[in-house]
């Protein structure tokens, strides 16, 4: 799932301007990294990496990275995201939880939310697993949740794009139906892009029929963090 993105020469030049500052905090926790990068560097590097990963690599990961604020506000946001990530991991151990920048990259694979072949409807097990996440999402209401749907490689490109959009939408509508605010959500479908397993076995194809989340601070959380809250 991890990929190396080749940045443009301009992006590399800008990124190198902040290499020393970033290197000094590379071993820090995510809260410390939010402060150590700094406001300007956080916004610039977050924008560059988020934009490039979103176009040429994992979209959810790029969205989570691209939301960087940096500075003291970034540290406060990072602390809240650290706590939320731990609670998600405890609530649903079958999910893959990754803290990136000032956001959370969450993969709900076949162990958490499974989709049958050519289906976008949620299975009873998928609903039960989503139910485990709802209390955490409600506790951290000042976050935006972007949902990305995916398919395996079977079928035509346009069909898979539509199917992946429907999968993301199914998850969104289920969560809204459980009381989460619709304004927090955005959905996208990426079809066969960003596979996390080979598509040459039934097991691998099942893993690729998934949804991923990018959980980031909303405007209120950002403003609260800037106010030191």
Residue ranges of model-derived segments:
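Amphipathic, membrane-active segments
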Residues: 81-112
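Short, solvent-exposed beta-strand/turn patches at coil↔beta or beta↔helix junctions
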Residues: 101-131, 151-158
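C-terminal motif of bacterial Sec signal peptides marking the signal peptidase cleavage site
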Residues: 17-21
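Solvent-exposed, polar/charged alpha-helical surfaces in well-ordered, non-transmembrane soluble domains
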Residues: 86, 90, 124, 128-135, ...
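Periplasmic OmpA-like peptidoglycan-binding domain that tethers envelope proteins to the cell wall
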Residues: 150-224
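Short, low-complexity, glycine-enriched hydrophobic/amphipathic alpha-helices that associate
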Residues: 23-87
């Amino acid at each position: 799932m991890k990929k190396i993105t080749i940045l443009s020469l301009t992006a590399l030049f800008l990124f190198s301007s902040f290499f020393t500052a970033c290197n000094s905090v590379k071993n820090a926790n995510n809260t410390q990294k939010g402060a150590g990068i700094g406001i300007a560097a956080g916004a610039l590097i977050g924008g560059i990496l988020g934009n490039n990963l979103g176009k040429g690599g994992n979209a959810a990961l790029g969205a989570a990275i691209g939301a960087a604020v940096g500075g003291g506000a970034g540290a406060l946001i990072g602390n809240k995201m650290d706590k939320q990530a731990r609670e998600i991991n405890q609530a649903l151990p079958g999910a893959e939880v990754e803290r990136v920048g000032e956001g959370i990259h969450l993969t709900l694979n076949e162990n958490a939310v499974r989709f049958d072949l050519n289906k976008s409807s949620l299975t009873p097990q998928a609903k039960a697993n989503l139910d485990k996440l709802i209390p955490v999402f409600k506790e951290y209401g000042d976050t935006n949740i972007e949902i990305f749907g995916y398919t395996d490689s079977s079928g035509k490109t346009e069909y898979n794009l539509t199917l992946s959009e429907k999968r993301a939408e199914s998850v969104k509508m289920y969560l809204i139906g459980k009381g989460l605010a619709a304004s927090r959500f955005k959905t996208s479908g990426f079809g066969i892009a960003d596979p996390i397993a080979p598509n040459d076995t039934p097991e691998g194809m099942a893993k690729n029929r998934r949804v991923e989340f990018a959980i980031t601070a909303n405007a209120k959380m950002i403003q609260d963090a800037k106010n030191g809250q």
